[in-house]
């Protein structure tokens, strides 16, 4: 391609993504756009085409981002190349969104005509504005009986401050308004500005592992041109590779000779090691490197930690491989080996949030067929010791001795909750129960309110989201951001079975609710742990002080069954003998703890 052809082609490229709250119809809209641009034959078309993971289709959410190249013949007779980068909408996957937005020039904002704007819509819009994207509002699901497009249009203007006078009214399901959306993309989204002659700069916004071709990086070319056979360098790791293939997704992978400015596609270079391609890294030429890497990507820190252990301990190495493969295109997942007396060898994993944790767990169980035990999730605490030292604790069993602790700080988040008027009381009650501090309350319109609270992250980790949804009949939407650490009265609670501490059941709790929590968990474990041949005491302890206790009664055989009437001393002898046996058993016996017992530690808030 010569210089003029490249420039002409570049002016016809439009890179955009679709942002929306969960269930506002983003994946369906993506399907319609693919259909309209004839990217697929009718036979290949299936609902939620870009949600390629089974788990995504089942839960009806988008987890991984996907990129696809489309050609569209606009009304002005010209052919345009559209790159659609699909994004997730759930709060845990904001980082997936920030990655795909960094690769675009425009974003379609989908808002449900019945529901209006929700918390995560706002969060994603602010991300898009941070990346200086052109935002095109689309009001979707106008064919619903409860749709009120005019109210929603007003809401977009009032709450977000976007001009919604030209917002497209659409129904992705019925295929209404799709052409107008495509025309607006062509008209309003700017073409990529980059120079194909400059040193190469490509941003990696995702990657996946192919056992035959090695790591395949999903890239957006910002400056320069990359061809097969080029020697390229990863700017974060400094590793160099030779490009073996480049191409685009139409949604199938299609090989090309080169990728140039504005292209969104893939690059393979026989990269064998997962750690060599970091998502968010910049690829440049080895011989003529760019002066600096591209901005627009931040390292994500996990917020929630838990232990993952294989039920069959022989599969420890398989679990390591599974985690490494998942980490490849999920840069926010972190893990390190750990051991537990109760569970053997496993990994301490860091996640962005609870949904992220559940999904990684399910993917390991499905894709790698490994049965897992998970321990209670915890957050990172900062512990200041009396000798002035500061230590970071992400695992309750690493908590130092209470006597040596000066103070403990825990992470707090700022939670914005959007909720209909009728449920404000219920939401406030939940937040106060979770040690939340009320900050602000704003009315969006006559029917909806945004509440802002500061809440300890450890309280959100358990079941805040479930409680919020069930107490507001599913109407509340919720978004949170970390704001820093604050001092709290926290203590570590240990659970003792038969006098022995089970390290995997330890958790960190606020002193005020320690007694209640200990009581609930001891009762719950009593139901879940099967009866043994001997009596098993279950105790909850803080340091050396026992705060709650319950006992699992022993199973016993009726040793008197063969005595008919007769002598009491004979009966007494048999009972004494049984008692002696139980005593001996108790001193050597160990108690098996079922998986449900570990989960009980998580779910104990339900009964309170």
Swiss-Prot record:
UniProt GO BP: positive regulation of translation
Catalytic reaction(s) noted: GTP + H2O = GDP + phosphate + H(+)
Keyword DNA repair belongs to the record: no
UniProtKB keywords: Cell membrane, GTP-binding, Hydrolase, Membrane, Nucleotide-binding, Protein biosynthesis
Pfam families xref list: EFG_C, GTP_EFTU, GTP_EFTU_D2, LepA_C
Superkingdom classification of source: Bacteria
Predominant cellular place of this UniProt entry's protein: membrane
NCBIfam families linked to this entry: lepA (TIGR01393), small_GTP (TIGR00231)
Family, as annotated: Belongs to the TRAFAC class translation factor GTPase superfamily. Classic translation factor GTPase family. LepA subfamily.
Protein name stated in the entry: Elongation factor 4
């Amino acid at each position: 391609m010569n210089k003029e052809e490249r420039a002409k082609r570049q002016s016809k490229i439009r890179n955009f993504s679709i942002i929306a709250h969960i269930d506002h119809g983003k994946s369906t809209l993506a399907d319609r756009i693919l259909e309209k641009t004839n990217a697929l034959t009718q036979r290949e078309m299936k609902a939620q085409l870009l949600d390629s993971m089974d788990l995504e289709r089942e839960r009806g959410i988008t987890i991984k981002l996907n990129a696809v190249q489309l050609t569209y013949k606009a009304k002005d007779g010209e052919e345009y190349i559209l790159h659609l980068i699909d994004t997730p909408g759930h709060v845990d996957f904001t980082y997936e969104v920030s990655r795909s937005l960094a690769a675009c020039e425009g974003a379609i904002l989908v808002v449900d005509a019945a529901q209006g704007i929700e918390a995560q819509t706002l969060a994603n819009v602010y991300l898009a504005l941070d990346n200086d994207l052109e935002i095109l509002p689309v009001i979707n699901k106008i064919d619903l009986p409860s749709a009120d497009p005019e109210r929603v249009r007003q809401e977009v203007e009032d709450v977000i401050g976007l001009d919604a006078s030209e917002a497209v009214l659409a129904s992705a399901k019925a295929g209404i308004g799709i052409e107008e959306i495509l025309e607006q993309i062509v008209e309003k989204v700017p073409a990529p500005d980059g120079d194909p002659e400059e040193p190469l700069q490509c941003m990696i916004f995702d990657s996946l592992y192919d056992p035959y071709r090695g790591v395949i990086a999903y890239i957006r070319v910002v400056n320069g041109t990359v061809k097969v056979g080029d020697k390229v360098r990863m700017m974060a790791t400094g590793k160099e590779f030779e490009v073996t293939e480049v191409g685009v997704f139409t949604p199938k992978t299609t090989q090309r000779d080169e990728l140039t400015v504005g292209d969104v596609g893939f690059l393979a270079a026989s990269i064998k090691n997962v750690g060599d391609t970091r998502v968010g890294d910049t690829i440049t030429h080895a011989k003529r490197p760019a002066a600096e890497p591209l901005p627009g990507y931040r390292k994500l820190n996990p917020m929630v930690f838990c232990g993952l252990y294989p039920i069959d301990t022989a599969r420890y190495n398989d679990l390591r491989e599974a985690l490494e493969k998942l980490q490849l295109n999920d840069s926010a997942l972190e893990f390190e080996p750990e051991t537990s007396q109760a569970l053997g060898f496993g990994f301490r994993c860091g996640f962005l949030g609870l949904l992220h944790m559940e999904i990684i767990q399910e993917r390991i169980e499905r894709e790698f067929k490994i049965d897992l035990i998970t321990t209670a999730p915890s957050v990172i605490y900062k512990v200041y010791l009396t000798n002035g030292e500061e230590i970071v604790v992400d695992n309750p069993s690493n908590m130092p001795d209470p006597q040596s602790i000066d103070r403990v700080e825990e992470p707090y988040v700022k939670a914005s909750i959007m909720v209909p008027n009728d449920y404000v009381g219920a939401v406030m009650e939940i937040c106060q129960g979770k040690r939340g501090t009320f900050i602000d309350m704003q009315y969006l319109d006559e029917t909806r309110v945004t509440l802002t609270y500061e809440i300890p992250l450890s309280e959100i980790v358990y079941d805040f989201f479930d409680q919020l949804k069930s107490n507001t009949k599913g109407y509340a939407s919720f978004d949170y951001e970390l704001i820093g650490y604050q001092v709290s009265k926290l203590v570590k609670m240990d659970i003792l079975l038969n006098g022995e501490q089970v390290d995997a059941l330890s958790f960190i709790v606020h002193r005020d609710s320690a007694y209640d929590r200990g009581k609930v968990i001891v009762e719950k474990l009593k139901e879940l742990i099967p009866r043994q041949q001997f009596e098993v005491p279950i105790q909850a302890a803080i340091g050396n002080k026992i705060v709650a206790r319950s006992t699992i009664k022993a199973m016993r055989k009726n040793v008197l069954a063969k005595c008919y009437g007769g002598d009491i001393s004979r009966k007494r002898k048999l009972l004494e003998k049984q008692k002696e046996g139980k005593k001996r058993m108790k001193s050597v016996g160990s108690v098996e703890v079922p998986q449900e017992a570990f989960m009980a530690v998580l779910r104990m808030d339900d009964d309170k």
